Amino acid sequence: MSTGLLAKKVGMTQIFTPEGDCVPVTVLEAGPCTVVRRKTAEKDGYDAVVIGFGVVDEKHAHRLSKPEVGVFKKAGTPIFRHVKEIRVKDAKLLGDLKAGDVLTVDKVFKANQRIDVAGVTKGRGFTGVMKRWNMKGAARDSSTAHEHHRHVGAIGQRKTPGKVWKGKHLPGHYGVDNITIQNLTVVGIEPEQNVLLVSGAVPGHADGLLFVNTAAKGQPRIKQKQEVRERAKPKV
């Protein structure tokens, strides 16, 4: 079985646990995704599965090249807007998946499972150092210049080094970065609507594309009852 799905961000809300705690969650429309291609180590050099999400209308299919359309025709699937390849180290994780199989949210994920969500952050345009790099800024009464207290300040010496070092935090474009939020928890699943409820926030705006995958850093351990060991009785 595949370890992840492509999803669309719907928005945020909150739910209440049986204990009465309020938990902020993000609603994701995860899948259904169709297997477009299955790759094997014998033929392709590694094990992977290619999934598609979001069917493309026929009037927009002409935007694809002939080789791209040929991939979908060979698999016998509709043309998808988004395609993602998921590599695995062990072919057993993919089971007997083949082209044309449909993956739903309840087949891939389960409640209380830890996941990683990857997406593109919101674009905020050209911003200053206080918003982009969380700089403190100058004192409000240290200068009479307009908005000088929001400036970057000193960025180097005159003669030594005589330049601005690469990587110096300066104003510039902020956002539109590929990031991954790790170890989020699946709070709930609604298979009828392909909805996945995830604790916390995920990157991107509403209707943004996301890739939801099994957490790379392990799953929560199930607490088991410790065995009570009897001490050996001393010999008399």
From Swiss-Prot:
Subunit and interaction comment: Part of the 50S ribosomal subunit. Forms a cluster with proteins L14 and L19.
Molecular-function GO terms, alphabetical: rRNA binding; structural constituent of ribosome
Keyword line: Ribonucleoprotein, Ribosomal protein, RNA-binding, rRNA-binding
Cited Gene3D superfamilies: 3.30.160.810, Translation factors (2.40.30.10)
Organism the protein comes from: Anaeromyxobacter dehalogenans (strain 2CP-C)
Keyword hit for Oxidoreductase: no
Domain of life: Bacteria
InterPro entries linked: Ribosomal_uL3 (IPR000597), Ribosomal_uL3_bac/org-type (IPR019927), Ribosomal_uL3_CS (IPR019926), Transl_B-barrel_sf (IPR009000)
Recorded GO CC terms: cytosolic large ribosomal subunit
Protein name, UniProt field: Large ribosomal subunit protein uL3
Matching SUPFAM superfamilies: Translation proteins (SSF50447)
General function of this protein: One of the primary rRNA binding proteins, it binds directly near the 3'-end of the 23S rRNA, where it nucleates assembly of the 50S subunit.
One GO term (biological process): translation
Stated family: Belongs to the universal ribosomal protein uL3 family.
